[in-house]
Amino acid sequence: MDPNMNNLLKWSIENSTSARQAADSNDAAPAPTSRSNLNPEMLSALFGGPSDADLMKAAMEALHSDEVDLENKMIAFDNFEQLIESIDNANNLEPLGLWTPLVELLKHEEAEMRRMAAWCIGTAVQNNEKAQDKLIVFNVLPTLVAMSTSDPAPAARKKAVYAISSGVRNYQPAMDEFVKHLPEGYTSGEKIDAADMDAIDALLDKLRAHPSEVSA
């Protein structure tokens, strides 16, 4: 991992951990603030440049790094998800080259990694046509449908359905692509309007009730 990216990740993790400890503490005394030695390059990246982009890239590097343990990957994922709640940051995923590595994590061996990847995708595409289109460009919907019906982890299946729900509502191209990959018998063959919330809800309810093909 690039040294500056690694330092940015550590800074983000340490400050996230300190904030959580402070929130969980019942002690009236303020929790000590974690301070890292931020060099000029890091300060420039954090405050003088595209800090959100740098943190997004650092988080993704951590998520694919064998040197980062699962606990810290979860923190990196949490930070990443909060960053892409911003539509501008969500739309920056493609220029930063982050869509492909994010989608790859849907097939990670760790269930929590799959769950968080689906959650992040759902956050990125919600009410965002530009990002919804990336579900087609990067062929994400077949993976999400398979995950929602066969992932051994219920929490991962639930987030896959959430990602689908966010991705197809009010965006017909994604809706049409989604229907193509549904299990047999889910639809009558008629076109489903992406603006028909009741029809979409009924379809997603079927997915939620779909028996997993693999025991949890």
Curated annotation (Swiss-Prot):
Single GO molecular function: adenyl-nucleotide exchange factor activity
Region (Disordered): 19-39
Pfam families: Fes1, HEAT_EZ
GO terms, biological process: cytoplasm protein quality control by the ubiquitin-proteasome system; regulation of translation
Keyword Repeat annotated: yes
Classification via SUPFAM superfamilies: ARM repeat (SSF48371)
ARM repeat residue numbers: 27-68, 87-126, 129-169, 185-216
Organism superkingdom: Eukaryota
Main location: cytoplasm
Gene3D superfamilies: Leucine-rich Repeat Variant
Keywords of this entry: Cytoplasm, Repeat, Translation regulation
Any one annotated GO CC term: endoplasmic reticulum
Subcellular location: Cytoplasm
Record bears the keyword Repeat: yes
Role according to the record: Functions as a nucleotide exchange factor (NEF) for Hsp70 chaperones which accelerates the release of ADP. Required for fully efficient Hsp70-mediated folding of proteins.
Assigned protein family: Belongs to the FES1 family.
Protein's name in the database: Hsp70 nucleotide exchange factor fes1
Species the sequence originates in: Neosartorya fischeri (strain ATCC 1020 / DSM 3700 / CBS 544.65 / FGSC A1164 / JCM 1740 / NRRL 181 / WB 181) (Aspergillus fischerianus)
Taxon lineage: Eukaryota, Fungi, Dikarya, Ascomycota, Pezizomycotina
Encoding gene, per UniProt annotation: fes1
